[in-house]
Amino acid sequence: MIIKLLVALIHYLHETMAVQSIITTPLLVILMSLRSYAFTEPSLHRQQPPSKGGVRAAYWPAWSDFSTSSIDTNYFTHIYYAFVQPAPESFNLEITESYKKWAPKYDGIHNIRPRVTTLLSIGGGGNNATLFSEMASSKQNRASFINSTIHVARKHEFNGLDLDWEWPGDEKDMSNLALLLKEWYKALVVEANTSRKSRLLLTSAVYFNSTISLIGNGPRSYPVRAIRKYLDWASPMCFDYNGAWANETGFNAALYDPNSNISTKYGIGSWIGSGVPAEKLVMGLPLYGRAWELKDPNDHGVGAKAVGPAVDTDGSMDYDEILVFNKDTGAKVVYDEVAVSFYSYSGTTWIGYDDGPSITKKVQFARSMGLKGYFFWAIGKDKDWTISKQASNAWGY
């Protein structure tokens, strides 16, 4: 009865848009966790036929040594070039020496068959969030940025533009994001009419949840109306749920988590519940895992104490690297049926990741929810296309 009352309360607060002003963050997290139980469990057996416009996408990191000419486009419909950045002060896209070096490698993608749709992605995880905030803060700044993106996209024959702003810092940023999307879309329509070319696509990578509440400056919600009206689709990044920033092991991209609201099911449900149609969502999937150094090698379950990352500075490991580690060390591999995720451990190293069976179920989940598609971060981490092929097959191709 108490849970029902709390669920009813948060539904009321959400509808009145008062949730962020009268509930403290800890209580908000508790209520959101309880609310996750109210979402209807999708049937993974009631598959929808893939839509004609279904998206099977992946990001190509420009710094990767993986050539675009080696991409098997049988498994993808869309490829993102990641990333370019706006310049300080002018907010025009910076065509740096690095970009000039990497762009020719990407240009070869136009010669691959079957053809794919290409998008230029702006921002990324290492972007200067303050710079994006400044860019979006005035009409003049937004216009400079928008005009520059269109110019660069047309010059290099991209089919669309993608915004990866990580992250809008407060509600003012979210309001300005709405204005940016509106003005950007209208500029794309005008340019298409003037050039007599197809309108450039406009998409955006977004937080896994429609409200950012666990990082940054307190809860702030994405501008759902603008996203629904002006984007071709939004791409929730359904990964990085756990990492070496917390000294205990956890899944990188749990589909379900009965104990919290940090899961793909909850995140996608929040986007749909906020008013973004399922057919405008492209769900993110990781081709990498997160590795910890265990505090005690005999304590190796989910939630085990750790002392930091096992590799690199952030503990990230490409899927191919994980397979090599598992084979070379004879690691114990465990599939968690509740989270729909894998983990492996050997000695003091513990890795949470996805493999073919979990990716297949996640793609089936996306289909059962009526989503527009899925995307991977990132090409080059699955060199023999093992997971990419299984995902494509699960989508129905």
UniProtKB/Swiss-Prot annotation:
Phenotype on deletion? Root nodule development arrested at the primordia stage and defect in nitrogen-fixing symbiosis in presence of Mesorhizobium loti.
State the signal peptide span.
1-18
Q: Which reaction does it catalyse?
A: Random endo-hydrolysis of N-acetyl-beta-D-glucosaminide (1->4)-beta-linkages in chitin and chitodextrins
The molecular function GO annotations come to: chitin binding; chitinase activity; endochitinase activity
Any one Gene Ontology BP term: chitin catabolic process
* Active-site positions on this chain: 166 (proton donor)
Gene Ontology CC annotation, any one: extracellular region
Q: Which EC number(s) are documented for this chain?
A: 3.2.1.14
Q: Which UniProt keywords apply?
A: Carbohydrate metabolism, Chitin degradation, Glycoprotein, Glycosidase, Hydrolase, Nodulation, Plant defense, Polysaccharide degradation, Signal
Q: Tell me the PANTHER family matching this sequence.
A: CHITINASE, CHITINASE 12-RELATED
The protein here is known as: Class V chitinase CHIT5
Query: Source species, please?
Result: Lotus japonicus (Lotus corniculatus var. japonicus)
The primary gene name is CHIT5
